[in-house]
C-alpha cells in the first residue's frame, strides 16, 4: 500500500451515499483506495503522469458490500475491464439517481473518458452530469462539446441551408390533381419566378401526415369534373390500376392558384413541345421521321430519282453532250461517250460473231468481245462451246478463225468459207488428218 501523501490526481475518488450502511461496510475517502494499486491496467490518460506503475483496484474484503462492483482481468492495454453491475436499486451514487435512470438518458463512458473503447463493457453515467472539473470527483481532460439532448444512437444530420421540399421538385407529391383551380401557370414561368412566393427554410417545419390525409391513386379511368376543368384534354389515355411500392403522400406546400399540376402535364407531346422549345433542326427531323414510312422505301425512291437523267445537277448539264436522237434524253460529259452512244441508235452492226452457226452482229466491238467471253467460252450452255475462246483450255487461241469440230475444238488449216463435211460420213480423226 502506497503512502497517503500521493498527489490528489493519483487517486480515483468514488463517493457513495451510505446512509443505510454501517461505517464498516461503506468504503470512503479514508479507506486508502487508490487506482494505482489495481492489478488491471487502466488508461494512463485517466490519471496524471505522477507515476509510471500500472494502477490497480484496492483488494479490500468488504468493498463489494455497498455498491457491487465486478472486476475482470484483461491482457489488452488501454481497455476498461470493470463495470458497474446491477444498477437497479434506488440507491444514489455521487448524489445522482442511477437505478431509475432511463436508457436514453445514460451516456457511455467513452464520451467522458477518451481512453475507453466502445466495444468493452461500459460504465453508464447520467447525461446530465456536469462536465466541469471537481477536485473530489473523477479527474478528466478538457470538457467535450455538448451534444443535443437525444438518444445516442440517433443519426443526427446537420441542418442544411435553404432547401426546397421534395414536393416542390416532384409533381407526384403535390396536392390531389382535382383540387387545384382551373387556370394554369404560363409555360414561360421558371423556378426563379416562383421563389418569391415560396416559404423560407426557417418556416419549413416537418409535418406528420396521417393515413386519413393520404388519397390513393384511382384504380379506374380518371374522369375530371366538368365544372372544374372545362379545358381538360379528351385524349388522355386510361390509367392502369397498380399498387405502388411506397405509400402515397399528399403534402401541401402552399402553392397559390395557377400552379402547374400533374394534370397539366397529361395533355401529351404538344404540351412538352410548348414547355421545352425545340430547335428548328430537331423539329424538322421529327416531322420527317413521321412522314417517311420506312427507310427501305425511301432509299428505293431516291435511287430511282437519281437514275433519271432529268434530275442531274445543273453544273453537269452545262458541260454535257446531248443525244440528238428523237425521244432519247441521254447526256454525256465527253464527246467520245456520245459517239459510242450514237452507235446504239444506228442500224449498222459491223461487228459479227465468227463462230459457225451464231453470226450475231453488234454495233460495238466491246459488245462482241463480251459476247465471246460470256457465251462461247463456257461448257454446258445452249450456245456452242468454242475451245479457242476458253482460257482454261489447251486449245485457247483468241485469234483463230476457222472451222470447229462438234465438241468445239479448232480444225487448223480450214477457213470459215469452207463447207463443213457431213458428220455422218467423216469422223473427228478424219478431220485431224
Curated annotation (Swiss-Prot):
BrlA, abaA and wetA are pivotal regulators of conidiophore development and conidium maturation. They act individually and together to regulate their own expression and that of numerous other sporulation-specific genes. Binds promoters of target genes at brlA response elements (BREs) containing the conserved sequence 5'-(C/A)(A/G)AGGG(G/A)-3'. It comes from the Eukaryota. Its main location: nucleus. It holds the Pfam family zf-C2H2. Residues 34-48 have a biased composition (Low complexity). Residues 23-33, 238-264 have a biased composition (Polar residues). The keyword Nucleotidyltransferase does not apply. A zinc finger (C2H2-type) spans 321-345, 351-376. GO terms for molecular function: DNA-binding transcription factor activity, RNA polymerase II-specific; RNA polymerase II cis-regulatory region sequence-specific DNA binding; zinc ion binding. The keyword Iron does not apply. Keywords: Activator, Conidiation, DNA-binding, Metal-binding, Nucleus, Repeat, Sporulation, Transcription, Transcription regulation, Zinc, Zinc-finger. InterPro entries: Znf_C2H2_sf, Znf_C2H2_type. GO terms for cellular component: chromatin; nucleus; transcription regulator complex. Residues 23-65, 238-270, 391-416 are annotated as: Disordered. Induction: Expression is positively regulated by pcz1. This is C2H2 type master regulator of conidiophore development brlA.
Amino acid at each position: 500500500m502506497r503512502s497517503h501523501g500521493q498527489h490528489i490526481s493519483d487517486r480515483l475518488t468514488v463517493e457513495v451515499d451510505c446512509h443505510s450502511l454501517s461505517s464498516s461496510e461503506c468504503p470512503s475517502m479514508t479507506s486508502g483506495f487508490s487506482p494505482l494499486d489495481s492489478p488491471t491496467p487502466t488508461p494512463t490518460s485517466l490519471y496524471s503522469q505522477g507515476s509510471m506503475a500500472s494502477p490497480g483496484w484496492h483488494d479490500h474484503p468488504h468493498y463489494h458490500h455497498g455498491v457491487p462492483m465486478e472486476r475482470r482481468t484483461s491482457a489488452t492495454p488501454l481497455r476498461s475491464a470493470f463495470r458497474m453491475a446491477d444498477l437497479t436499486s434506488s440507491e444514489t451514487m455521487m448524489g445522482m439517481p442511477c437505478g431509475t435512470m432511463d436508457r436514453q438518458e445514460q451516456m457511455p463512458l467513452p464520451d467522458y473518458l477518451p481512453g475507453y473503447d466502445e466495444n468493452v463493457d461500459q460504465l453508464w453515467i447520467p447525461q446530465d452530469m456536469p462536465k466541469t472539473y471537481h477536485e473530489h470527483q473523477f479527474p478528466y481532460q478538457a470538457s467535450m462539446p455538448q451534444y443535443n439532448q437525444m438518444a445516442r444512437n440517433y443519426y443526427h444530420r446537420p441542418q442544411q441551408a435553404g432547401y426546397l421540399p421534395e414536393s416542390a421538385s416532384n409533381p407526384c407529391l403535390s396536392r390531389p390533381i382535382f383540387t387545384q383551380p382551373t387556370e394554369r401557370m404560363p409555360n414561360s414561368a421558371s423556378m426563379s419566378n416562383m421563389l418569391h412566393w415560396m416559404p423560407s427554410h426557417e418556416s419549413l417545419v416537418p409535418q406528420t401526415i396521417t393515413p386519413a390525409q393520404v388519397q390513393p391513386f384511382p384504380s379506374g379511368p380518371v374522369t375530371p369534373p366538368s365544372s372544374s376543368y372545362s379545358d381538360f384534354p379528351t385524349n388522355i389515355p386510361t390509367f392502369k390500376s397498380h399498387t405502388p411500392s411506397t405509400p402515397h403522400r399528399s403534402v401541401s406546400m402552399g402553392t397559390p392558384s395557377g400552379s402547374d399540376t400533374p394534370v397539366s402535364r397529361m395533355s401529351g407531346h404538344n404540351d412538352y413541345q410548348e414547355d421545352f422549345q425545340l430547335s428548328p433542326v430537331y423539329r424538322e427531323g421529327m416531322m420527317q421521321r413521321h412522314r417517311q414510312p420506312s427507310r427501305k422505301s425511301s432509299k428505293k425512291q431516291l435511287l430511282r430519282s437519281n437514275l433519271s437523267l432529268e434530275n442531274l445537277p445543273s453544273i453537269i448539264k452545262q458541260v454535257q453532250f446531248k443525244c440528238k436522237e428523237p425521244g432519247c434524253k441521254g447526256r454525256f460529259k465527253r464527246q467520245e461517250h456520245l459517239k459510242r452512244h450514237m452507235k446504239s441508235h444506228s442500224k449498222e452492226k459491223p461487228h459479227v460473231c465468227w463462230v459457225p452457226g451464231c453470226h450475231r452482229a453488234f454495233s460495238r466491238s466491246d459488245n462482241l468481245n463480251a459476247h465471246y467471253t460470256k457465251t462461247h467460252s463456257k461448257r454446258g450452255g445452249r450456245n456452242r462451246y468454242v475451245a479457242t475462246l476458253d482460257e482454261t483450255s489447251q486449245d485457247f487461241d483468241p485469234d483463230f478463225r476457222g472451222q470447229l469440230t462438234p465438241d468445239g475444238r479448232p480444225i487448223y488449216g480450214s477457213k470459215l468459207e469452207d463447207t463443213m463435211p457431213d458428220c455422218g460420213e467423216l469422223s473427228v480423226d478424219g478431220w485431224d488428218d
